C-alpha cells in the first residue's frame, strides 16, 4: 500500500494531480512519491516522530514532481490554497455558532500558546497587547526546519499557503499573517484581533 494514502492532509492531492497531469502520469507520480517517502523514513526512521513530520510527504512529492520536470512548487502551493479554503469554510461554520467566536477569543492566549509552543518545535516571540491584540512571531517552524534539512525547503510552502487561506475563515476574529520564514522573512507574524463586524 502507498504510505501517502495514510497521510490525511495529502489525500486529495492525488485527485488534483490526475486533473492536472492526467490519470496515468499522476498515478506514476503518486506511486514514486510514496516510494520516496518510504526511502526518507527508512534512511532516518526518527523523522516519523519529528514535530515537522507533516512536511515529509510534501518533500517526497516535491522531489518526485521536480524529477519529472513538473512545477512542483506551483502544484503543491495550489493544493495548499485549496485545502486552506476548505478548512476556512469549516472554521467559519464553527465560529458562526453563537458565542463560539467570543469563547475562542476569551481563551486565545492559551490556544496560541499551545499551538506554537516550544514543545512542538517552534521558536517564537510573543508580541501580544491584550485585550485588543494577540500576536506571536514564529522565528523558526519545525516544518520548515525539517524540509530545509532535507534540502527541499520550498516543499513546505504548501503548508504555509494552507495556513494563510484557512485564517480567513474566522468569524469576528481577524487572523492575519503578512510574512513567513519559509519565504525568507525573519518571522511568521501572526496577529489576531477581535472584530465584531467581521462576518
Regions found by a protein language model. Give the residues of each.
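Short flexible/disordered coil segments
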Residues: 2-3, 9-10, 54-68, 145, ...
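Charge-dense, low-complexity intrinsically disordered segments
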Residues: 4, 48, 99-102, 150, ...
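Amphipathic interaction/junction segments at domain boundaries or subunit interfaces
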Residues: 53, 57-59, 63-150
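Residue-level preference for well-ordered alpha-helical positions
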Residues: 18, 66, 167-168
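N-terminal, charged low-complexity regulatory/assembly segments
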Residues: 1-63
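C-terminal non-catalytic interaction appendages of large macromolecular assemblies
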Residues: 132-135, 142-199
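Generic structural motif
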Residues: 28, 122-125, 175
